Amino acid sequence: MKYPLFDALEEISCLTNFVEIMSACGHSLPEFLEAAESFPLRYSIHSPTSDGNIAEPTEKIRKASLSVICESAEAADILGAETLVIHPGFCLEKDMFEKSYEALLLSISDLERMQDEFSVRFAVENLGSWDCCHFRYPDFVPILREAGLAFCLDVGHANLNSALDLFLDSKPEHVHLHDNHGVWDEHAALGSVDIDFSKVMKLDAVGIIECMEYEAVLKS
């Protein structure tokens, strides 16, 4: 995180009244909750992505990962955040992928129960094109719906899997907007590379510009 959370929010609040906070490093919640409470903004929260793995077959690690998400949900409730974005996890060992997927399904059930304890909506995000990633295609969306969880469409990730058109019919509640060449996860400015955003903009969903650099946000 390039800037302290307060400074980043002060700058961004001049552009929008809706901000998604990535809960990590110098923007971790609840550690820096006071900074977020200083602004009259609407929020969504992205739970930490490097502090756990809800698709981890080792039960202690899976449970610890859910505990981190629970802390994010508590902070989200304090802020009155509308959505908590959650990554579905990964598996680095091919021969363990099936067990990892089973662990993910257990976590989805746990998230269903956890969501009932809070007022924030839980949204699970589709991931990129690495073989280790779960939820690369829309066939996982019905599992989320059955559990009462929302779907966060990451447009850039969908493009990496040549699956954007397939995902558009899944009626996401939350959308991450960024561009790429379809090769790696660039998080480039909207319209600067390959993705046709005209179809995306027709979605009835909250859109979050998720570019890597502040200058790319301004270009978007």
List the predicted regions and their residue ranges.
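N-terminal pre-domain/capping segments
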Residues: 1-71, 150
